[in-house]
Amino acid sequence: MSTKVDIDHLRKWIGKIDNVTDYVTPIVEQRYRATLNMDIGNPKDGDPVTSGLHWMLGWNLVKNDELGVDSHPALGEFLPPVPLPRRMWAGSEIKVLKPIRVGDKVIKQSTVADIQVKEGRTGLLCFVTAEYNFLVNDLSLIHISEPTRLSV
């Protein structure tokens, strides 16, 4: 069975932006440290957060019945509705320009940067590249370029 992908339709998602605001409170930092089995300490406003905490920030609230079969938000809102059954993370390039700090109001700005369809050994592949900027006071502190591979 061959799946058809309308690349012209999918490319309409290029440039789509989604902004989610989050707040780094001391308890957010402590919960992250506890997750990593670290001493939770007593973080104060202005302290740099533990490396990797940005992965916990800026997630959209999605009701259970709005999830796709892979438990991610259903395709077609931010990410295009690629008609392939598997979604895989294909890696990231991360640039930390400045640390996020406890007390920061962080805006995670997500942008669909590119969409490409390719033929692989196992069939059709669609690469959706999203870029994520974590903004504090309109300055990008962390930039992530992340291709996601959807495949048959």
What is each PLM-predicted segment?
Residues R87-N137:
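Hydrophobic beta-sheet segments that form the core/acyl-binding groove
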Residues I142-V152:
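Single conserved hydrophobic/aromatic residue that forms the stacking wall/gate
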